[in-house]
């Protein structure tokens, strides 16, 4: 019996769905997949900025500064900053970590 042939019958307190296939493993699996899909979609919409920012920028780190003296690190930061400074009134956002 397909889901389109379900019959709803009024009872004393509520509407009840008479469906003989509700214990079918395929129906149970489809219900579980549907619920998981809904949960994942809601989480994606709530945290999409965090998730996609992590995927976009989290995997692309700058050059490693391990073992480099602090003076050279500061010099590198200043070079990077001066390379993007524009005197035309344009603004450039730089994220230094």
Curated annotation (Swiss-Prot):
GO terms for cellular component: host cell plasma membrane; membrane; virion membrane. Residues 60-83 are annotated as: Disordered. The record marks 41 as: Seems to be involved in pH gating. Residues 1-22 are virion surface. Signal peptide: none annotated. Forms a proton-selective ion channel that is necessary for the efficient release of the viral genome during virus entry. After attaching to the cell surface, the virion enters the cell by endocytosis. Acidification of the endosome triggers M2 ion channel activity. Belongs to the influenza viruses matrix protein M2 family. This is Matrix protein 2. It comes from Influenza A virus (strain A/Goose/Guangdong/1/1996 H5N1 genotype Gs/Gd).
